[in-house]
Amino acid sequence: MSVIPMFPLGSVLLPGEHLPLHIFEPRYQALVHECLKQDDPSFGVVLIARGHEAGGGDVRHDVATTAHIIGHEAIGSGRYLLECVGGERIRIDAWLPDDPYPLADVRPWHDEDSESMIDDTEFDTTWARVEDLYELIGQLEATENIASPGFPDFLGLPISAAEKIWSLAALIPMGQSDRLDILSAPNVRARKTALDDAIENVTAVVQFRLQP
């Protein structure tokens, strides 16, 4: 276990996902200042359960992701523009008093069953569901005159099933609750089930919006 700085957000950061941040609150300016002294500047990102990002007083979940700072720019008055990427999943054992930014005692949360691997062929149904979803999203774009997210590049996805799930979850426009379910799944097989459920949820929302 180790104590690390934490950044509560209104969104879930998934492993491998890129996260741009504009740091303007003084307490998080201090967090970044301290992080940049490290060889591998990083902090934890956790979803806020209740409350708001700014001002403190929020209630937070107990599963999080490390965020590695891969680029930063000081833009004056102590503010920063950061480019971060999600690292490993972590479990929060205890929250410490803010000093001045949130701190937590955390430990890595590895998959609980290394034997629960899945084969590439098990993604066939998932691919079909994603294709159906994006066809519906295209219809929604035409009827509501909105910009739809680009279709995921399946050929560009990682080879391993575990990384493929993280990448797909980051690409599909799902809600934060679904993203949290995927992050909180105990192993790869459960994570794929959570991903499939999330795709169904998004599909149901789009179908509802397409109703006359």
PLM region spans:
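N-terminal low-complexity, acidic/polar interaction/targeting segments
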Residues: 1-212
